[in-house]
């Protein structure tokens, strides 16, 4: 199995790339970080530190790397059996032209073996979005051929992979938690789905996408935002603070009530899933900084993301949402000198005031009860900070 993976960052190396390599794939990473590419090509292997109760070091072998802007990438797509990505939602559109070029070359070479493309991003149906960008760069004839021979498979991914420790001398070593979940839409494959241990097939992907978004992502973000307000440095410190924990757990229970209603999830199993996530946040071996986890507050406060989407579900089913609203107010309070979106958030709040700013960012009506409620909690948070 020939595999090409876009994004040689921590998630690429520590999660998706590792599962592909473990499955015996001939794996090539595509990235723009030249020192990383040089190191991968020189060593052909790297170490993954799996941390948790059963800590272990695993070696990933027989890998190579190419620059994602190079002609080699196009040639690799023309030959590959599977193409995966972990580049971040913003970058997906940027790699689409290269993917399209690879598919055109594949067509010209008469390669009709099935190819499956799987975007492994923190977003809902990311591969379908990538497909739209790719198709925009294809002629009608090419689109027809691609539709026949190439599967665009949506997925849900979950593994906490913090950035490398400062002062780490090995550019390739990566630290990951023990838990990992990669769920793919089994209905979207062309040909037989590849056998990859750790990749699960489902015919009800949206249930898993929303379960992860509404629980792990919602909880992680609110832990970061409340943690920063309370002066904590890491996610572990924040979630061990009883006041933070109470709101985070409350928010996950509120979003969970939406999932139970929407997808008929078993309430007891979902409660166990929430507890499992809380214990993952407590992992003493993961030094996950609240400022890093809180980054890009404008994206995280947008209509389809981890804070507003579950809130909209509570409104749809007339369910409680006080903790989610507190989380939204905390997100509005996020500050970071390093993050352009945090700076933009401050500007919007100053120019428009909290009510109009939240309405603009989230798409919620400015005169709605939930916006009033979020603004009132936000104002109380700001007053507390001022004292």
UniProtKB/Swiss-Prot annotation:
It catalyses: D-mannitol 1-phosphate + NAD(+) = beta-D-fructose 6-phosphate + NADH + H(+). One of its GO terms (molecular function) is mannitol-1-phosphate 5-dehydrogenase activity. Transmembrane segments: none annotated. GO terms for biological process: mannitol catabolic process. Its EC number is 1.1.1.17. InterPro entries: 6-PGluconate_DH-like_C_sf, 6PGD_dom2, Mannitol_1_phos_5_DH, Mannitol_DH, Mannitol_DH_C, Mannitol_DH_CS, Mannitol_DH_N, NAD(P)-bd_dom_sf. Pfam families: Mannitol_dh (PF01232), Mannitol_dh_C (PF08125). Keywords: NAD, Oxidoreductase. Belongs to the mannitol dehydrogenase family. This is Mannitol-1-phosphate 5-dehydrogenase. It comes from Yersinia pseudotuberculosis serotype O:1b (strain IP 31758).
